[in-house]
């Protein structure tokens, strides 16, 4: 994304980007929690705030970061992540909107250019009928394209094929698959894993390999070795982020 690359000038040094970060504000009056009980939501209680993360970020040599809206903590209230991205030029926000709220289109328009760089289509728990690629939700994709927002999709395995449909219809839109769609990629024979790998045929689909994916691979394979080479065989290294 152009805003993430802007201003980077370290000669001989590759930019290191944390592509999936969740933070929780310490000021609960200004940024009240609106919890959703997703499995594993306990992390919300121990998550760092922006000041704590920035120190860790500097010590680890991370140049920039994508602050992903945590649905488990704030659902569709993006106030905290937008506040952080407005104060810290090295952090960029990925927001969630309510697809059923008619005011969401205006919400997207109000995102400040260069601070919010992506939308996260959050479809968990899975709906009875998938909405991410539904014609009546096309306005989300069109508005995202108009504002040059990357589209991140967080779904469970039963909606993986919907991502392919979206990637085909909106072929100029980058589509990032959060958590590799929760596919059990350690088992290459699993139909869900095959559905994920089939998305490689769409050049605008990118896989996000988060710690959930890495931990699952290690638990089943005993080592991280082989994970990224396996995914790169299908998607290439240029379409993997972690």
Which residues does each predicted region cover?
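Active-site mouth loops of central-metabolism enzymes
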Residues: 37-46, 92-100, 125, 129-131
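An N-terminally biased module of ancient metal coordination in phosphate/nucleic-acid-related enzymes
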Residues: 3-70, 75-76, 112
């Amino acid at each position: 994304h152009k805003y993430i690359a802007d201003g980077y000038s370290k000669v001989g040094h590759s930019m290191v980007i944390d592509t999936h970060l969740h933070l929780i504000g310490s000021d609960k009056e200004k940024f009240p929690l609106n919890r959703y009980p997703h499995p594993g939501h306990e992390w919300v209680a121990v998550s760092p705030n922006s000041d704590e993360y920035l120190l860790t970020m500097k010590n680890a040599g991370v140049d920039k970061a994508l602050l992903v809206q945590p649905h488990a903590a704030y659902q569709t209230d993006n106030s905290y992540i937008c506040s952080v991205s407005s104060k810290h030029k090295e952090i960029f926000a990925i927001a969630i909107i309510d697809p059923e709220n008619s005011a969401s289109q205006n919400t997207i328009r109000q995102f400040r250019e260069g601070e919010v760089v992506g939308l996260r289509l959050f479809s968990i728990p899975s709906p009875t009928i998938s909405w991410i690629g539904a014609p009546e939700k096309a306005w989300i994709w069109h508005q995202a394209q108009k504002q040059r927002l990357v589209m991140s999709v967080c779904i469970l395995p039963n909606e993986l094929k919907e991502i392919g449909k979206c990637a085909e219809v909106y072929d100029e839109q980058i589509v990032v698959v959060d958590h590799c769609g929760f596919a059990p990629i350690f088992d290459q024979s699993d139909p869900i894993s095959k559905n994920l790998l089939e998305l490689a045929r769409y050049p605008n689909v990118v896989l996000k390999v988060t710690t959930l994916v890495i931990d699952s691979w290690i638990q089943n394979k005993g080592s991280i070795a082989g994970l990224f080479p396996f995914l790169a065989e299908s998607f290439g290294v240029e379409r993997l982020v972690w």
